[in-house]
Amino acid sequence: MTEFLGVDGGTIAYDVTGDGPLVILSHGIGDHRQAYRFLAPKLAQAGYRVASADLRGHGESSMGRMSVTGADDAITHPDIAADLLALIRHLGGPAVIVGHSISGGAATIAAVQAPDLVSAVVELNPFTKKQSLNLGGFLRIRRYRRGLSNLIGLQLFKRPGFWFRYLDVAYPTKPADYDAYMAALAAKLREPGRMAEFLKTGKSKPAETGTRLPEVSCPALIVMGTLDPDFADPRAEGDAIVAAMPAGIGTVAVVSGGGHYIHAQSPDEVAALVIGFLKEHARA
């Protein structure tokens, strides 16, 4: 059942399942909380209270909110972090945040800003540090070239076709409900204002998150898909994130053959990694 949390200037949509220590699931750009349709029930069955939330401007969450930066045309890592912390306070933290892509970076910021509320973070294929074009990778690695080209096209031409061509690359193998899920996502992005909200995430700057990595004090698990088209070398990206954290804080795991959406493509493997981590670090 969808619930709504009133936050500064709008509402965040979320649903809760299960009982136990609190786990917050936060999806990536251009998606909605149903991205965790496979992972959330597995975590609930393992004994956790799981809240899946829509990013601001996405899914059923409200549109048109002012960024914490003061801009009205941006959805940034700090914005998402603020919403996640508001949800944790509302539900009664502390919580472990599981953040995908942009939400991985947001989880980092939330953990630094409120260490009393965030007991640990799991970052799935995260954008948590400054990105730059890997020219050699662009020339040599087809998945990286195809993924990046479509993302550039999306920002330049603002047409959803580029996004769905990117998603085709980002899921190297498709879940059984892929076509139905993409149809539902396309319908959501056709709603008035939704595509414009999605494009606001292009104003986010992972570099502002990367500068906070040395301040992380809670355990962190970084999970990378080896075929993620967003990175020329996904394992190296994960290693670099952990290297920027204090020694002993972070751990990297990889999902062989996984794309950018490992939680939907390989939910059993991701669930095993996350549940093992939660058993050590989640607390009521």
Where are these regions (language model features)?
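Alpha/beta-hydrolase fold catalytic core
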Residues: 1-24, 45-48, 67-68, 75, ...
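Active-site loop/oxyanion-hole signature of alpha/beta-hydrolase fold enzymes
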Residues: 45, 55-98, 102, 272
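Flexible "cap/lid" loop of the alpha/beta hydrolase fold
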Residues: 112, 120-152
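Conserved alpha/beta-hydrolase catalytic His-Asp/Glu region
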Residues: 132-133, 154-215
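Conserved loop-alpha-helix segment in the C-terminal half of the alpha/beta-hydrolase fold
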Residues: 217-258
